[in-house]
Each structure stands twice: as structure tokens, then as C-alpha cells.
Amino acid sequence: MERTSNGGMLYHEVQESNLCAVHCVNTVLQGPFFSEFDLAAVAADLDGKERQVMLEGAAVGGFAPGDFLAEESHNVSLGGDFSIQVLQKALEVWDLQVIPLNCPDAEPAQIDPELESAFICHLHDHWFCIRKVNGEWYNFDSLLAAPQHLSKFYLSAFLDSLKGAGWSIFIVKGNFPQECPMSSSSEASNSFGQWLSPEDAERIRKNTSSGSSARNKRSNDNVNQQRRNQALSREEVQAFSEMEDDDLKAAIAASLLDASAAEANLGAVGTSEKETEKQK
């Protein structure tokens, strides 16, 4: 049976700027172990090693060293997004290994993800972690106000939906830290980390969902009212068009009637004139 860690509490970080990679690493470790400066240092170290390899290759291939020194970092973007290599190196400090879910070594996890302890998910510039804590699975996406509990059945469905949407998924393997002293964690959390009981996390999510539902209801009501107005406008236009058609038909009929009457009157006048001439 898995031992309860951190007194049964969940560690969650809410999105701050573009620091989702930092949030992802810390929620994998379940504690504020890394800051953005720590990951930036890891990225700089990787950049230095990569440039050294490129310089050595330049000497063999006849390229100028300046061709590579001007290269931008491939491990951290100007917006603060870190590469998977940075996350891998950071987790290696804790003797954890990161491997792609679609590689042959990960076949058991593909069949039964419940066997694992953590997944890292990445799409475009966003990272988040799915983690088993005290025997229960949670989605620690930093865009969420609190961790989202995932049932064992829903875990597989959720991972499949992410893969179908184009997300890259990695497994984290190794011996995860069991305890993170909360006294020191509050100092290192940079104000975006929080410890929550599973009950508190559920309560926060329900309150957030209720607020979102109310906003969505108001938005939907507005959309529905706009649609009703548009439908009413279309009906009015159609009725007006039909009215115009009826009026046009009536006007044409009246015009034809007037023309017939005029012709009849004209014919009567002509006949009367002829009879007058005969009498003369």
C-alpha cells in the first residue's frame, strides 16, 4: 500500500506569467523545489554544452565558429517557455527519468496508465502534470484553480483525448520525493504555490465551476436572445416582403382595373360620338 505523503495534502501551483514548465516540474515533485531561475540556469547549461558540441563539429566540417555562437537558445524562449530537455535535466536531479509515452519502453503504460505515477503533457507553449498522489490521480494543470481529481477509468480516457488532440505525453519514472517540509515550502513557493487537502481542492473547483456556469449561462442567454432577435428580424423581413408582395399584387390589380375602366369609358365616349355624327 502506498504511504501517505505530505500529510495527505496536494501541492498545486496556479499559472503565473509563462511559468507553466516550472509549475509542471514542481507538481510532479509535489513541492516548490524549482524556481524559474533554477530552470533558466539548467537551460543555460544545456545551451553551453550544445554550443560546445557545435563548435567541435564546426572545426571538423569547416564552418566558422561565429555561425554557431549567434544561435538562439533552443532550451528557453524569450517568452519563458522551456524545452523538454530542461524538464528532463531538472527531474534528473531527483533521480527521475522522463520518457515519451509513444516509445517501445512505455508499452506497459500505454496499456495500463494506472501502473505509472506521473505524466507530463505538452502542447505548443503549455506544460502540465497528471500525478498520482496518495493512490489517487489528479490533473495539476496550472490553468486550474485547484487540482482536478481523475478516476482510474477517466485517466485512460483523458490521456487518449490528449493524444488525439496532438499533445505530447511523457512518463516520469523513479523514486519520487515523499515529503516536502511545508514550513520551508511557503518561502519558496513564490506566491503561486499552495497546499490543499483533497476536500479543499474539490470545494474550490466546485465554486469555480459554479461561477463559470453562471457566467456561461449569462453568455448563453445573451446569445440565445440575439438568436431570437435575429430570428424575429428574419420573420419580420419575410412578413414585410410578403406584405410588399401582396401590396404590389393589389396595386397591379387596381392598375389593371383602372386601365380596363378607362378603356371602357374611352370606348363608350367613342361610340357616343359616332352616334351623334350619324344623327347630324
UniProtKB/Swiss-Prot annotation:
The keyword Acetylation does not apply. Disulfide bonds: none annotated. GO terms for biological process: protein deubiquitination; proteolysis. It comes from Arabidopsis thaliana (Mouse-ear cress). The keyword Transcription applies. One of its GO terms (cellular component) is nucleus. Pfam families: Josephin. Its EC number is 3.4.19.12. Gene3D superfamilies: 3.90.70.40, 6.10.140.100, S15/NS1, RNA-binding (1.10.287.10). The active site is at C20 (nucleophile), H126 (proton acceptor), D141. Residues 183-194, 221-232 have a biased composition (Polar residues). Residues 183-240 are annotated as: Disordered. This is Ataxin-3 homolog. It catalyses: Thiol-dependent hydrolysis of ester, thioester, amide, peptide and isopeptide bonds formed by the C-terminal Gly of ubiquitin (a 76-residue protein attached to proteins as an intracellular targeting signal). Keywords: Hydrolase, Nucleus, Protease, Thiol protease, Transcription, Transcription regulation, Ubl conjugation pathway. Residues 7-187 form the Josephin domain. Residues 243-262 form the UIM domain. It comes from the Eukaryota. Its main location: nucleus. One of its GO terms (molecular function) is cysteine-type deubiquitinase activity. It is found in: Nucleus. Interacts with key regulators of transcription and represses transcription. Acts as a histone-binding protein that regulates transcription. Acts as a deubiquitinating enzyme.
